[in-house]
């Protein structure tokens, strides 16, 4: 109560922060008349002036007012749009590195230009992050008009670009792209072998659009670049045949935790099936040698019990394609890891693709925390403000709307069964359609959207075929005639190619659009329809300019008329009075876009996003959720008690219960789920931070190695450290000579370093100590390496040293990632022994990391001590492109092997001597200096011709 009173008297902290920006808004407004007088060239020249002022010592904060005023003026001249005062405030929040929460239709894309331009003046590159390629292209194409007018360059990163195109896009002042592409480019860059092949140029400032979707909804799924392992499709198919043979008593499913475990009876049955199939090693399922079999049994169980076709994935063209649970979009190319995707393929009797090995991975949480400054925009972040601050140190600032929100949010209607709920939704759609009010129905899955579509078809509605040209002509004609068209559109993962078009036209009179969750997010729904979309669709084939202009005028008139129809599509409802009270009264519910939610999502934020599609820029609108006790949220979180209560109240079939208490109870259930999901994400981050710290060490070290002209000092240090470890192991400090393992040391030197040294004779010398032994071994090893440098030349050896070091580091890092994954899967069991799994994981991960570094020293030293360089037997005409080897960023590898150099042990073939050289036969060339003319006769230096990869 005291807090509420204080907020009423002094305003909330958010109100005070917003008011704090007003003085700068006034200063920007004061500059407007002055800038309006400038010519285009004078306005453009201000960019150069700002850059000079930065060079002279001014800060970006010092330039905020004049820079924002300049962007506003440029926007007026290029786009015909002027930033509102509240949009200026949004730009300031972004510049300060926080999250601007702005309602749908408030112009977030335009707001971003303010902070983007200001920060781009620093010359370090600004990244604007969107959720899909369409939005990246659209926003870059649209906003580059402002940036280009002011002399800044704009690039776009989308799927399918090669490295040269990516590098050019990142070199621009401003780069638009998707969160996936930025993350994968970072991972691929850290798999390259030369600095000039890297495409990104740092992480200075990023603005994340739909920040809640990217930093929260996708935080649990890491970006993974992987490569295929051996084909085990027969094994997966065999395991899959076992699951249908199990009864429900053989396993226990926990839907809340998304886990499934075998019971004692189930284990015995599986053991018998495995034994009969010849897949069981030893006596018991839980013998050590059967660990991977147990893992795959569990994955097959999960595939059959926890994953539903058309909800969690779809089957398309012989492939199992994941569906994003938050957006309902297909995610082609992305695959579940650790055998789960293969289990789904076996379940659906599709070709089982090879399992993948993780080559590199990072979570969005850790990728975006690398930026010096991070900001975000969204329409719904307030409910997750604590998490955004806790993990990313981002404060959420609610920006006031330019016009008050005029949407009516009605109480939920709760029915007993899903069938009753769908019948009520259908009746509501028919009432709205009869008065030409456009309806957007939100569903939680493809399966639910298609159930609704089937209901509509049964009642005489036809689905719009967006594969045909002018798909909406019948809808437009019916709207002009003032009649319902009885047509509907479905927007889900199956039809995401037409996503923007379907969403943009969801505001046409009589339109019925069924959309999974938040599909189409980022595209505004304008009442009456989208002018840009219709012009694009309806003038595509018109070449005559006069005819085109006339068509555009007709479309404009159409949309203006349609908008009026939608605004007038109000509903007058008669409310029956209670017994003994006054006569019935009527209530008018607004027109505009009508949002119908077919069930509540686990997160309040997703529900708010759906509501937020209506009521943009002060337009009227309404929203209502229809629920049933059979919905997932209701079923998992206590529908049994509610069902018995409704029975006692005498609720009849087809009747709904509507009360604010129900809304509050649901909100509490959602808060519990949100809190649980936050804890899961937070816990995952704690574990991922362990790997992230190690990743940073390895990636930073790789970049340093690539920057160095020569890694000879590093190689020498590694060799000496390995020899030191070897001597310490076999000749411990302060041990007596009789305790030395001289024979073991001699064998190890021969095995690893290929050095046959008289260690046994040295050990018998009077007064010899471990330090003297160490020094002699190091000297002999150094002499062996010096001889190789003398034989092959310093240029060749420097290249070989760097390549072997980087390749070995990459190989061991990948093996280390597998070890960490396995450790993470089993570490939770330590909790049963009263030990903290996180602390245990940290300790063991560090031990594994130290072991990897020791192994690196040994492996690199061993390879270099034995390496011989053999020129190729014949010239390679073509070479594989040095880029990631995967169709989609989720399953790719960026690995470079020797093209024209073979590394063989010294026991193999000897080097080819330099004889009389035949220009057409590279095998006769012998050793060629990198700066010599190429023996092929091209006239180029060897290093620029056949020696490029030697």
Curated annotation (Swiss-Prot):
CDD domains in the cross-refs: DEXDc_SecA (cd17928), SF2_C_secA (cd18803)
UniProt keyword annotations, A-Z: ATP-binding, Cell inner membrane, Cell membrane, Cytoplasm, Membrane, Metal-binding, Nucleotide-binding, Protein transport, Translocase, Translocation, Transport, Zinc
Compartment(s): Cell inner membrane; Cytoplasm
Binding-site list for Zn(2+): 934, 936, 945-946
Region Disordered, residue ranges: 873-892, 908-932
Named cofactor requirement(s): Zn(2+)
Membrane topology listed for this record: Peripheral membrane protein
Taxonomic superkingdom: Bacteria
Enzyme class per UniProt: translocase
Binding-site residues for ATP, renumbered to this chain: 87, 105-109, 524
Chain's role: Part of the Sec protein translocase complex. Interacts with the SecYEG preprotein conducting channel. Has a central role in coupling the hydrolysis of ATP to the transfer of proteins into and across the cell membrane, serving both as a receptor for the preprotein-SecB complex and as an ATP-driven molecular motor driving the stepwise translocation of polypeptide chains across the membrane.
Family under the similarity heading: Belongs to the SecA family.
Protein name: Protein translocase subunit SecA
Organism whose genome encodes this protein: Bradyrhizobium sp. (strain ORS 278)
Lineage: Bacteria, Pseudomonadati, Pseudomonadota, Alphaproteobacteria, Hyphomicrobiales
């Amino acid at each position: 109560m005291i807090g509420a009173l204080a907020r009423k008297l002094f305003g909330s902290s958010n109100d005070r922060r917003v008011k704090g920006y007003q003085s700068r808004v006034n200063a920007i407004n004061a500059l407007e008349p002055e800038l309006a007088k400038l010519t285009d060239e004078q306005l453009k020249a201000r960019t150069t002036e700002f850059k000079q002022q930065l060079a002279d010592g001014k800060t970006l904060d010092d330039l905020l007012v004049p820079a924002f005023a300049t962007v506003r003026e440029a926007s007026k001249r290029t786009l015909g749009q002027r930033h509102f005062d509240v949009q200026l405030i949004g730009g300031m929040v972004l510049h300060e590195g926080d999250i601007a929460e702005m309602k749908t239709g408030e112009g977030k894309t335009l707001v971003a230009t303010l902070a983007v331009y200001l920060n781009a003046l620093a010359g370090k590159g600004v990244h604007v992050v969107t959720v899909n390629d369409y939005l990246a292209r659209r926003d870059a194409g649209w906003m580059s008009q402002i940036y280009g007018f002011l002399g800044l360059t704009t690039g776009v990163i989308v799927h399918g670009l090669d490295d040269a195109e990516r590098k050019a896009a990142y070199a621009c002042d401003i780069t638009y792209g998707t969160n996936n592409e930025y993350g994968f480019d970072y991972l691929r860059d850290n798999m390259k072998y030369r600095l000039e092949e890297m495409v990104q140029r740092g992480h200075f400032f990023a603005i994340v659009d739909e920040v809640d979707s990217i930093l929260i909804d996708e935080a649990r799924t890491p970006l993974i670049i992987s490569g295929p392992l051996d084909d085990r499709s027969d094994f997966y198919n065999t395991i899959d045949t076992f699951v249908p043979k199990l009864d429900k008593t053989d396993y226990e499913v926990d839907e809340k935790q998304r886990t499934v475990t075998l019971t004692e009876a189930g284990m015995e049955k599986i053991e018998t099936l495995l034994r009969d199939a010849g897949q069981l090693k030893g006596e018991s399922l839980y013998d050590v040698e059967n660990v991977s079999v147990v893992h795959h049994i569990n994955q097959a169980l999960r595939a059959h019990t926890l994953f539903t076709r058309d909800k969690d994935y779809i089957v398309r063209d012989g492939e199992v394609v994941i569906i994003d649970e938050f957006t309902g979009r297909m995610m082609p190319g992305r695959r579940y890891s650790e055998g789960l995707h293969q289990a789904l393929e076996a379940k659906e009797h599709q070709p089982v693709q090879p399992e993948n090995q993780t080559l590199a991975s990072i979570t969005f949480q850790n990728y975006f925390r690398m930026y010096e400054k991070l900001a975000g925009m969204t329409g719904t972040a307030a409910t997750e403000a604590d998490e955004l601050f806790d993990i990313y140190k981002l404060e959420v600032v609610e920006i006031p709307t330019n016009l008050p929100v005029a949407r009516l949010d009605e109480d939920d209607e709760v029915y007993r069964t899903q069938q009753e709920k769908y019948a009520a939704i259908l009746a509501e759609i028919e009432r709205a359609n009869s008065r030409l009010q456009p309806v957007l129905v939100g569903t939680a899955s493809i399966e639910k959207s298609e159930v609704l579509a089937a209901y509509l078809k049964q009642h005489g509605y036809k689905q719009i075929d967006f594969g045909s040209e002018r798909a909406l002509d019948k809808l437009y004609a019916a709207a002009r005639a003032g009649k319902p068209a009885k047509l509907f559109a479905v927007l889900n993962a199956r039809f995401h190619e037409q996503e923007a078009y379907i969403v943009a036209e969801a505001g046409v009179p009589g339109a019925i659009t069924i959309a999974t969750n938040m599909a189409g997010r980022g595209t505004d729904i304008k009442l009456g329809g989208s002018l840009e979309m219709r012009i694009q669709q309806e003038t595509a084939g018109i070449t005559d300019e006069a005819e085109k202009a006339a068509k555009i005028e007709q479309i404009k008139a159409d949309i203006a008329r349609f908008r009026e129809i939608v605004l007038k599509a109000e509903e007058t409802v008669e409310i029956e009075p209670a017994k003994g009270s006054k006569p019935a009264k009527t209530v008018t519910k607004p027109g505009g876009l009508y949002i119908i939610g077919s069930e509540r999502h686990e997160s309040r934020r997703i529900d708010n996003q759906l509501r937020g599609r209506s009521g943009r820029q002060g337009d009227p609108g309404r929203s209502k959720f229809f629920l049933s006790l059979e919905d997932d949220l209701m079923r998992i979180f206590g529908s049994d008690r509610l069902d018995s209560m409704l029975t006692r109240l005498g609720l009849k079939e087809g009747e709904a219960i509507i009360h604010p208490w129900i809304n509050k109870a649901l909100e509490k259930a959602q808060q519990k789920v949100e809190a649980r999901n936050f804890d899961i994400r937070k816990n995952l981050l704690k574990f991922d931070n362990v790997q992230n710290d190690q990743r940073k060490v390895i990636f930073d070290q790789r970049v340093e190695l690539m920057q160095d002209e020569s890694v000879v000092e590093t190689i020498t240090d590694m060799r000496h450290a390995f020899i030191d470890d070897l001597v310490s192991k076999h000749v411990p400090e302060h041990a007596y000579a009789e305790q030395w393992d001289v024979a073991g040391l001699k064998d190890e030197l021969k095995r690893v370093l290929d050095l046959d040294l008289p260690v046994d004779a040295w050990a018998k010398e009077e007064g010899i100590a471990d330090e003297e032994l160490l020094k002699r071994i190091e000297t002999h090893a150094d002499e062996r390496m010096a001889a190789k440098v003398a034989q092959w030349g310093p240029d060749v050896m420097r290249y070989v040293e760097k390549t072997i070091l980087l390749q070995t580091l990459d190989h061991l890092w990948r093996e280390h990632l597998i070890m960490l994954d396995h450790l993470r899967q089993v570490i939770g069991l330590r909790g049963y022994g009263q030990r903290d799994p996180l602390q245990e994981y940290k300790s063991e991960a560090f031990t594994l990391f130290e072991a990897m570094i020791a192994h690196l020293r040994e492996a690199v030293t061993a390879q270099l001590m034995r390496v011989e360089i053999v020129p190729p037997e014949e010239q390679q005409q073509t070479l594989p492109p040095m880029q990631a080897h995967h169709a989609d960023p989720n399953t790719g590898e960026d690995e470079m092997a020797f093209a024209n150099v073979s590394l063989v042990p010294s026991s193999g073939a000897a080097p080819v001597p330099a004889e009389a050289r035949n220009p057409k036969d590279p095998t006769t060339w012998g050793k060629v200096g990198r700066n010599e003319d190429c023996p092929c006769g091209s006239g180029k230096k060897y290093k620029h011709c056949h020696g490029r990869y030697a």
